[in-house]
Design a protein with these regions (language model features):
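One-carbon transfer enzymes
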Residues: 1-200
């Protein structure tokens, strides 16, 4: 199927939050946007998830005969799940961005494209690094947009255990995304050590 006849369902961020919807239209795709948990896959040639807050049900993944692609701001297999931008610094794991196929797990699908991103967390806030990661994954997508749309890629399985975090694991004492990364990580870890020492 020619790129210009592709009908794409874009899940998650809207036009004000990402440039990718317009980028897809520039190369001739017809794009519908959806952010709710419920959507109809009928008639689409490709589903793209970016900033989508819901888990796509396994029956949808199995029934949809075309690719479902996710854009995740972590260097998979590290930091699957929620708040990868926080956990990469807290756990001292690699930072980066990954475009991958969606399977039945959470951020466990085969990798299409990936980029490591390095930061100086002494000078940055979590918000700064989030915005940088978002820009990096958009650039990675745009660079490979024709291959992604036409399925001209070779996927590779994720290797290694990596890590996973859910929403509830974000520390309740976390001051927020405008915090200086280095200062906040030190503060949270010191607080955790004090709690452990009190219990022992």
């Amino acid at each position: 199927m020619n790129v210009f006849s592709k009908k794409v369902l874009f899940l998650g961020y809207g036009k004000k939050e990402t440039s990718l919807i317009n980028e897809l239209k520039k190369v001739g795709c017809s794009v519908d946007f959806e952010k709710s948990a419920y959507f109809n896959t009928s008639g689409y040639d490709l589903i793209i998830s970016f900033g989508y807050k819901h888990i796509i049900k396994e029956e949808i993944i199995l029934d949809f005969k075309y690719p479902i692609i996710n854009l995740h701001i972590s260097y998979l297999p590290w930091n699957r799940g929620s708040h990868p931008n926080f956990w990469s610094f807290y756990d001292s794991t690699p930072s980066g961005v990954t475009i991958h196929l969606i399977d039945g797990g959470i951020d466990t699908g085969p990798i299409l494209y990936q980029k490591y991103v390095d930061f100086d967390n002494n000078e940055l806030t979590f918000k700064d690094t989030y915005e940088r990661l978002k820009k990096e994954i958009e650039k990675l997508f745009i660079k490979n947009i024709h291959n992604i749309i036409n399925g001209n890629y070779v996927s590779k399985m994720q290797t290694g255990k990596g890590s996973f975090h859910n929403k509830k694991q974000l520390p309740s004492e976390f001051k927020g995304w405008d915090s200086n990364i280095n200062e906040e990580i030190i503060r949270l870890k010191n607080k955790k050590l004090k709690i452990i020492s009190k219990k022992s």
